[in-house]
Regions:
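Positively charged n-region of N-terminal signal peptides that target proteins for export
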Residues: 1-4
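Bacterial N-terminal signal peptides
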Residues: 7-15
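Sec/Tat signal peptide C-region and signal peptidase I cleavage site
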Residues: 17-21
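Eukaryotic scaffold repeat domains enriched in small/polar residues
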Residues: 22-348
């Protein structure tokens, strides 16, 4: 197990240094990537508005899915030009408090709902194909959150899950998230295989403190945004820890691009806690190779586009066209990257 270096600038010098004397580069040394923003490109139906745009994803046709918290949780589909196509799952029992949406290689749409503790697989047409987890039973009136340690995690029951991904074999990985502090692996039919972490938060490699985002790369390695530990972790396909990425701020969300040469995009949206007073401190996204070498950064905090106000999730199917969902600005942006114009410079 090893720690990932956080800048390509220092790579040559590090190669000659002993492993335990290597000085980790800081974010100030990462080149800036130029980009342009296309805000307000989505066209909801008349009289409809996007709420907290916590989750975005695209399919192979370029259609865009937004899973958002409005008057109630809703899942909208738009075409590549941003025109509204349809709503999926209207009135669905598994929707209460949106957290993540992903699209698999067969264009099935998967939602992760923090409120119902359910992960749902929809067909491209919007038919429910699979459900993982279960909704808690109804209670009368408001109930206080139980004091003391979390209850032991169960194989098929989640506690405020956050994200979902798949390896090339179709195995399913879920970050189970706010209470259980674990990553769970299931086979493609939903049978439990393994887990990393437990209901007790921890800081060691292979332990988590609010695993907030998850993706699987083409090698089958699992990338986890370990939010309250201020890091990203990379696990192998059996959920054994390989390395961690630190010095990129809060591990808020992670996205892995498609294609033969994949990149990781990592969001440092604000200090942990998500308090309004912190929204203007950070807002950048980092682009990295799968070995952890950071190639550049882009973005800044701001209420108006092209600024970010807490990037909760990204789609990076095309590594030069990033779609962001922002929780505090209720906004979805399309970002066109111009990586050939990246210029070295200190972080702002």
């Amino acid at each position: 197990m090893k720690r990932i270096l956080t800048s390509s600038v220092a790579l040559a010098a590090l190669a000659a240094a002993p492993a335990f004397s290597q000085r980790k580069a800081t974010i100030e040394h990462v080149p800036s990537i130029e980009f342009s923003s296309v805000p307000n490109f989505l066209k909801p139906p008349p009289g409809e508005y996007l709420g907290e745009s916590v989750a975005v994803a695209t399919n192979s046709k370029g259609h865009i899915f937004v899973y958002h918290r409005s008057a109630h949780t809703r899942l909208f589909e738009f075409d590549k030009a941003g025109n509204f196509v349809k709503e999926i799952g209207s009135g669905y029992y598994g929707f209460e408090f949106a957290h993540s949406v992903r699209v698999d290689k067969d264009d099935n749409i998967w939602t992760v709902d923090e409120g119902t503790n359910m992960v749902t697989k929809f067909s491209p047409e919007g038919k429910v194909l699979m459900v993982l987890g279960r909704r808690p039973p109804a209670v009368q009136g408001a109930q206080p959150f139980p004091a003391g340690p979390n209850a032991p995690a169960q194989k098929y029951v989640f506690c405020r899950p956050t994200d979902v991904g798949w390896d090339p074999q179709g195995n399913i990985f879920v970050s189970d998230g706010y209470c259980n502090n674990r990553v769970v692996k299931y086979d493609k039919s939903g049978r439990f295989l393994a887990q990393a972490g437990s209901e007790k938060a921890g800081k060691a490699l292979g332990e988590f403190n609010l695993p907030h985002g998850l993706q699987v790369d083409g090698q089958g390695n699992v990338w986890v945004a370990d939010r309250s530990n201020f890091r990203y972790q990379v696990l192998d396909n059996n959920l054994k820890p390989l390395r961690e990425i630190t010095n990129l701020g809060v591990g808020w969300t992670v996205c892995i691009s498609s294609g033969p040469h994949q990149y990781a995009f990592l969001s440092n949206s604000n200090p942990n806690g998500n308090m309004p007073g912190t929204w203007d401190i950070t807002g950048e996204i980092y682009k990295a190779e799968l070995d952890g070498t950071v190639l550049g950064r882009f973005g800044h905090p701001g209420k108006l586009a092209p600024g970010f106000q807490v990037v909760h999730m990204m789609d990076c199917r095309n590594p030069n066209e990033i779609i962001t969902g922002e929780i505090e600005s209720w906004r979805v942006q399309k970002l066109i990257l111009h990586p050939t114009t990246a210029a070295a410079g200190a972080a702002q």
